[in-house]
Structure formats: C-alpha cells, structure tokens
C-alpha cells in the first residue's frame, strides 16, 4: 500500500516532481523507491526511509522518465519497490490477497516475499506465450484478488503501462509532459490538465526511451527497527495467558457482572444498565436517507461521497450498502496509525477491489506512533489502572481530523459512516470514576463538560505514573480534540437508517466478499485492530469481563440474542488471543513475558 507517481518529460519540472513526491508521503513513509533514466540506463534506487530524502539523494531531475513510490509497508520488509525481475519492473499500490494461489498456477519461480512480485511474473508469462503488453492488465486482474494500481516499466520495449482495478490511479498532462499519481489531488496540486481516472478496462500504454541494458539497482538500508515482526509460536508464552471463568454475580437479564463500574441490581437481580436502556437499533425509514443524499449525487462517474473505512466489519458492510443499496459512488478513506493488522488491510483490499472503489490512505509515521504507545504502556505497567487503558488507543483519534483533510482534497462534502450502534462501552470511562450517561444516543459525545470531567479525572490518574507525561501527550490531546469538539458537517450514520444485524453482516462479508477471519478467535469483531486483544485480555483478567460482554448485553436488550446464547459466545470470545497479543507487544518492542506477568499480577476486582 503506497502512493505511486511518475512523470515523462523532455525537461522535468523540479518543483512539480517535488510536489508529487511530497503528496505521496500521505500514504506512507516507511520506505521508498525511484526508477529513472540516467545516461541511457534505467536506475532503480530503493530506500528504507522516506521518499523526500531519497529524492534529495538521487536528484533525478535531468532524466526524461521518473517513477516512484512512498510506501506503507504491509509485507516483505526486506523487499522494496520497484520490484524487478529480469527486464521488467513494477511499482504497485495495493495488496494482493491470493498471491500464493496465483504463484501455484504459474511456471515462474518466486524470489521475494513481497506480494507485488507476482504481477511481474504474470507479465513475463504473457509475453513469453506470445501475448502483447496490452494483454497484461486483463491477465493480471483476472488472476489476482485485491487492490492493484500499478506502473510497469519495460525498458527493452520502451513502454510504460498503467492500470488499476479500483481507480486509485490518475493521469494528466501539462503541455507535452505526462504525469500520473495515486490520487487526483496530487495532479490538481501541480495544475495538470485533462485529468482522468484509470480503472478496470481503462489502461494507459506510453512510449518511453528504450534500453536493452539491465537495471542498475541500488538499495539504501539504515533502519534497525522491525516494522513487521515475524510471528513465532512459543508454547511457554501462550501458557502464560490466564483464562479463568470467575464465579461473578451477573445481571439476570443481560450478562454484565458485579465488577462493572456503577452497576446496581434490583431485588430481581436486574441491573441498572438494563433498566435505563433505550433501544438503539431502531432505524428511521431508509427513504429518509435516500432523500438526504439526493442533493449530493453527482453525474456520470464523478465520486460523490467519502466513506471512513477502517476495514472492520461495520465499515465494510457499510461500504456494501452504499454501493449496492444507495447506489452512490464513494471514495473510501483509511487512517493507518500502525495498529491496523495485516488482516485488516487485506480485508480493505478485498472490499475495494471487488466493489471497484478508490481507497485514499492517510498513514501516520508508524515508528513514531508505536513509540508513543510504547511509552504510554510502559507508564501504565508501572501503575496499572483500568481507567487508563484508553491511553493506549488515543493515537487513532486523528482518524476524525483527516476526514476534513480528505474533504478538502477531493471536494466531496458528504461522509457516510458505518458505526455499530451497539458498541457502547461505559466501563472504559467508568473505571476512571465517570458514571454512565444513560441518555446518551451517540457512540461519541462532544459535550464540553463531560470532556472536562473526563480529562480532569484522567490527569489525576496520570500523576500516579509520571511516565504518561511524555512526547506523545500532544498527539493524544489533539486527536481527542478533533474527535470530540470539532463540528461535524454533511455527516450521516448508515445504521440510523439500516437495522444492524450481526448475522446479515457476517453472511454478506463472508459469503459475497470472502472476508478473511482471524485465526485466534471465532468473532468477526475487532479482528483488524491490533490493540483489541491486549486490552480485552487486561479487562477480562482483572475485572472478569471485556467489551465483548457489554456488546452481547446490548444485543440481549435489543432482542437479537438470548442471555444463554451470549454466555456461550462469551466463553469463546473472552479466550486470550495469543497471536494477536504477541504481535502487539512485538511491534511495540516490549518483552512479552514481562508485560503479561505484570498484567497477571494485578489484584482482581472479584474474589478468586
């Protein structure tokens, strides 16, 4: 997943190239690569640092062809792009989710871990079997599943091929100069004319200077941090994870336990959360939403709405509804803050490729974000406090800020959200001493006084471990400001108009889109979130329940499942997810055994 760009020109405009390069960084800065013509030879320079630095090192401004990428690493840490095999190179934005299957059907030998290599191998077979370059897009897109937006360079034939299956590829010109980029905004910035989107059968084949010499390849490697730690199963580590079934008093109507903050039971054993519950999953007529979006529709192929897209089950099902039911032409927006798992990214790729939907990525500096989480978790471990667990996920709140960024870049105002109305977890603030507001209708409240109380109580808790006062504090506070205080306009929730039905959601995603599930849990909820397994382990180990209990309790109150069904589901859903917990701690560079032993030693809120 990356931002790709390129220019063909007799005299490259240095300022325009720098502008394209700078915008491509929005999609990831983990690594970079350039391919350019110098002294009659095509050079490939790849680096494990950001693309602006590489551009400064290489300075390819005297070339007539420059293509490149700024990459959010998803697999193949030791590999980088452009990917080169013999006389063909590719720069690929996207994730191929079935590359192992494709390789098994090719006669070519695989050399790298990176999924993008298979695109070049397919191209080689097409040409060796007597096909033409123009036959390559159809062959690649018919074999590969997942997002593919790429630039292929054929020096021996003097050709550059551009194609995409989801529209994350735009072309334009300035006079005789040709440009391409992953997003239209990149070409708008440099004031290109005749900007067009490439998708499916629309591809572009261009003439470039030919050359029969081999690529001159140079790799720059300075990183010591492992952004994609390899998972290794260690039985002794898995055994450290506790899974007890504590005998806790629970509500006789739902499944909330006596350790839930501010819970009270009446003489029949029914909790105050049940008695004060107001139905949430009662949608308004769908016709109202159709009327609301009518004024936002645009003619032809012009995109008309933004879909904030995490890759979780609710945003994926929401995208399905927007395309199939509302018949809108969306662009999805994903904020990758370093805790989106590969599984989550692959499901994003599945959905966007199958529905033919462009995906704009805003990627944080993953190393920086993970450093912030590590500092806060280290502070938490010195003084464990259930009310402070939210500090570990504060970095993702910039998701809300960048919705406005994408609105400005695309000129699209309407944003449609797929937020599950039953995902309400009062206990996360309850453990800070903030009582539940049973009148709250939204998942997120922007009440100023409520926020003031929350921050005041959190500040007091932070003083118990001064490590919280670190370099991440501004990132935390600014993200929460954008989530809670900024005014939201042209903003609608799909499930205010569609009833949320877990069985239907799962049937559609698993059946129509062959959605991928996690290997360590039967649920489809939170499986693309790298933080969830750890924080739910903490809650369950210390308090005897997790967010699964609150979610299933809401389903009981809504009449979607019975209490007996919920208890059976929770027995599985609350089991520790060793692979995900191990991944989380490895990406943060923390000692698994030390962290888990601290969690296990925290005094329980229930009698053992």
Please identify what each model-predicted range represents.
Residues 95-96, 311-316, 421-423:
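Gly/Ser/Thr-rich loops at beta-strand to alpha-helix junctions
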Residues 92, 309, 334-336:
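Short beta-strand/turn micro-motifs composed of small residues
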Residues 4, 152, 162, 307, ...:
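Structural beta-sheet core signal
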Residues 77-80, 137, 319-321, 402-405:
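Catalytic micro-motifs at enzyme active sites that drive phosphoryl/nucleotidyl and oxygen chemistry
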Residues 9-11, 305-314:
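Short, glycine-rich nucleotide/cofactor-binding loops
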Residues 1-229:
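Conserved short alpha-helical segments that host acidic/polar catalytic motifs at enzyme active sites
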Residues 316-327:
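Histidine-anchored nucleotide/phosphate-binding helix
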Residues 201-205, 210, 220-305, 325-608:
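Nucleotide-activated chemistry modules centered on ATP-dependent adenylation/adenylyltransferase
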